[in-house]
From Swiss-Prot:
It comes from Acidovorax ebreus (strain TPSY) (Diaphorobacter sp. (strain TPSY)). The keyword ATP-binding applies. Belongs to the MurCDEF family. GO terms for biological process: cell division; cell wall organization; peptidoglycan biosynthetic process; regulation of cell shape. NCBIfam families: murC (TIGR01082). It catalyses: UDP-N-acetyl-alpha-D-muramate + L-alanine + ATP = UDP-N-acetyl-alpha-D-muramoyl-L-alanine + ADP + phosphate + H(+). This is UDP-N-acetylmuramate--L-alanine ligase. It comes from the Bacteria. The gene is murC.
Length: 477
């Protein structure tokens, strides 16, 4: 038998799906190293934990590694991958490494086109509040923990299940949530929506016979697969036939208040829920968590405390505060990772509910040319629901440009639709200045996208702070 695996190297360790696995393995006692194309707060955090990280890729970085972990974003000709194959070092896809982690615990996997990160974070928070000390691996930073991964001492591990590359079919959970099924990442499924739905059925059938599927039946595609699911099911949603159902839903500032009726096999008392998140889509995410909690016999008081005290996830409706507007007064700056029209519509609706009557300014960077092409008309519709739009070029994410699927084409189509006059900004680096200069008193500015626009809100804050310092110096003279 070959020597035991001791040193694991991650190619692309800064990725949201990679850094969490790396951190958990480090905490399990493995020697962990990794590389990424650019420096980032994620790399610096891993370094502070004792993980050796490198900026850039080179064959020398895998020295001493017993296994090399890659994500689907890493190309086959990456020098570290080539070196590993040449030296007969196992090259392990990220999803398979996550599967190995799940063997150590009872796995709860959260799948779906939208809402995975928030739902996974809520489940981890509820289990933590109940004293179950879960291990979790999340695709975003759980604010209360200051990280997107943690090695707990309890019997459960909570993970996101990624359908984008089909890798969720490697996982072996004992409980699985499907928040929704939507036409995204269709290239993985040959642009066949039926194949995508069947993949979710296959994912659910990866569970043992005693596993439980928790499904949102408000989503038509999820409802479609119900007859095909052979394991026990708990349904949730706003629909009348949902076993875990929310009624009397209302927005109260940036919170949602609602009543939950639980009829999943037994009749439990109704719950009066305060959720410290905005938007009806987050009510659905919370219902999934409430269904999980019922299956695990989590006490209601712990469940309600966790939902009311939830401090959110990085880049998911993340407030950067009320900032000074150039013409006097203040505007609210919010950041969100949403980059699909369905996600954007939900987030814009949440902003309208949380800040009624205020002008909503959307700063958006499309993500991937293929998604822009496939969802072009839906993007035009959802962008048109904002009061003002700042639009920049598509974040390619490694794709080649596609004719008529770029940022300018989207801006032209939005202009022709006539609902809003977009401002096109060639370079996303210029967006912070445009936001700082153009935001008015009372505006809600929402920066959305999964690409480099993620750095814009912090730069807006820095810019306005510098402007304020200069103004103070001018007044002092």
């Amino acid at each position: 038998m070959k020597q035991a695996i001791r040193h694991i190297h991650f190619v692309g360790i800064g990725g949201s799906g990679m850094c969490g696995i790396a951190e958990v393995l480090h905490n399990l006692g493995y020697v962990v190293s990794g590389s990424d194309l650019a420096d980032s707060p994620t790399l610096r955090r891993l370094q502070s934990l004792g993980v050796a990280t490198h900026v850039g890729h080179a064959a020398a970085h895998i020295a001493g590694a017993d296994a090399v972990v890659t994500s689907t974003a890493v190309q086959a000709d990456n020098p570290e991958v080539l070196a590993a194959r040449e030296r007969k070092i196992p090259v392990v896809p990220r999803a398979l490494m996550l599967t190995e982690l799940m063997r150590l615990r009872k796995g709860i996997a959260i799948a779906g086109a939208h809402g995975k990160t928030t739902t996974t974070s809520l489940v981890a928070s509820v289990l933590g509040e109940a004293g179950l000390d879960p291990t979790f691996v999340i695709g975003g930073r759980l604010n209360s923990a200051g990280t997107n991964a943690k090695l707990g001492q309890g019997e459960y591990i909570v993970v996101e299940a990624d359908e984008s590359d089909g890798s969720f079919l490697n996982l072996l959970p004992v409980m699985a949530v499907v928040t929704n099924i939507d036409a995204d990442h269709m290239e993985t499924y040959g642009h066949d929506f039926g194949r995508l739905k069947q993949a979710f059925v296959d994912f659910l059938h990866r569970m043992p016979f005693y596993g439980t599927a928790i499904l949102c039946i408000d989503n038509p595609a999820v409802r479609d697969i119900l007859p095909l699911v052979t394991c026990p099911v708990t349904s949730y949603g706003l629909s009348e036939d949902a076993e875990v159902r929310a009624v009397d839903v209302r927005a109260v500032g940036t919170q949602m208040h609602f009543t939950v009726q639980r009829r999943n096999g037994v009749t439990l008392p109704d719950l009066q829920v305060v959720l410290n998140l905005a938007g009806e889509h987050n009510v659905l995410n919370a219902l999934a968590v409430i269904a999980v909690a019922a299956e695990l016999n989590v006490p209601d008081d712990a469940l309600l405390r966790a939902l009311a005290g939830f401090t959110g996830v990085g880049r998911r409706f993340q407030r950067h505060g009320d900032l000074p507007a150039q013409g006097g007064g203040h505007f609210t700056l919010i950041e969100d990772y949403g980059h699909h029209p369905v996600e954007m519509a939900a987030t814009l609706a949440a902003a309208r509910g949380a800040y009624p009557g205020r002008r909503l300014v959307l700063a958006f960077q499309p993500h991937r040319y293929s998604r822009t092409r496939d969802c072009f008309e839906d993007f035009v519709k959802v962008l048109g629901t904002a009061d003002a739009v700042l639009l920049t070029e598509v974040y390619a994410a490694g794709e080649a440009p596609i004719v008529a699927a770029d940022g300018r084409s989207l801006a032209r189509a939005l202009r022709v639709a006539g609902t809003v006059e977009p401002v096109f900004i060639d370079n996303v680096a210029d967006m912070p200045q445009r936001i700082a200069a153009g935001a008015r008193d009372g505006d809600v500015v929402l920066c959305m996208g999964a690409g480099s626009i993620g750095g814009v809100p912090a730069k807006v804050v820095d810019l306005l702070q510098k402007n304020e310092l200069l103004a103070q110096e001018g007044r002092a003279q």
